[in-house]
């Protein structure tokens, strides 16, 4: 709907924004009026055929990986993002932690149902079309890039445990404490043992060639 595109445009970047859903595209176009540096397209992350190879300095894949379930679709989305990025360019892939999904949703609903939906009896992570969102083990997501022409820079937590905590009726923080939490979170956002507790994560890499 333009949140990221407008923020980047305000920082002086030229932005090509791709939206799958027509109604969301209309909102994006409406919200980005007056920003000549934003070009909005309707498209699919698994087929960015409207863009030539090596078109962009940076590519953000924010959202599609939450809703792609088959290995074929997942790999197409990754390959397309890499294809349209210039050699040496940066790529940012947002994804969800399956464990944080359990903590932030299952504890407030039916743990048994969520567990059956997200894990096999052997506790392997499941991905299937009927899931509204699909989550990953961090190492599982990182392995998707093993054979890709990219250099892994880092994997970082975006929101930490806040999504789970904000649902508690007794949870509140002062503005001063929230500012302190942000600084603290940024200091530890790449710490491996904390990654799985964050709902949203970023896989950050550089295209090699």
Describe the predicted segments one by one:
Residues 1-48:
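Class I SAM-dependent methyltransferase SAM/SAH-binding core
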Residues 46-59:
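A short acidic, Gly/Pro-enriched loop at the edge of an enzyme's catalytic core
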Residues 130-149, 153-155:
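Short alpha-helix
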Residues 154-209:
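A C-terminal cap/extension of S-adenosyl-L-methionine-dependent methyltransferases
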């Amino acid at each position: 709907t333009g949140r990221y595109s407008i923020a980047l445009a305000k920082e002086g970047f030229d932005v090509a924004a791709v939206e799958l859903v027509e109604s969301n595209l209309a909102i994006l176009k409406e919200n980005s009026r007056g920003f000549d540096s934003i070009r909005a397209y309707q498209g699919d992350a698994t087929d960015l055929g409207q863009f030539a190879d090596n078109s962009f300095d940076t590519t953000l894949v924010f959202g599609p990986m939450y809703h792609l379930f088959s290995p074929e679709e997942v790999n197409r989305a990754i390959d397309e993002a890499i294809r349209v990025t210039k050699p040496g360019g940066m790529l940012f892939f947002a994804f969800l932690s399956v464990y944080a999904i359990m903590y932030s949703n299952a504890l407030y609903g039916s743990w048994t149902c969520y567990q059956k939906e997200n894990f096999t009896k052997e506790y392997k992570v499941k991905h299937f079309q009927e899931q509204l969102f699909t989550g990953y083990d961090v190492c599982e997501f990182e392995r998707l890039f093993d054979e890709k022409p990219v250099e892994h820079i880092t994997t970082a937590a975006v929101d930490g445990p806040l999504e789970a905590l904000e649902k508690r009726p007794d949870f509140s923080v002062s503005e001063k404490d929230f500012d302190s939490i942000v600084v603290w979170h940024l200091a530890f956002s790449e710490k491996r043992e904390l990654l799985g507790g964050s709902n949203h994560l970023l896989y950050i890499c550089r295209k090699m060639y």
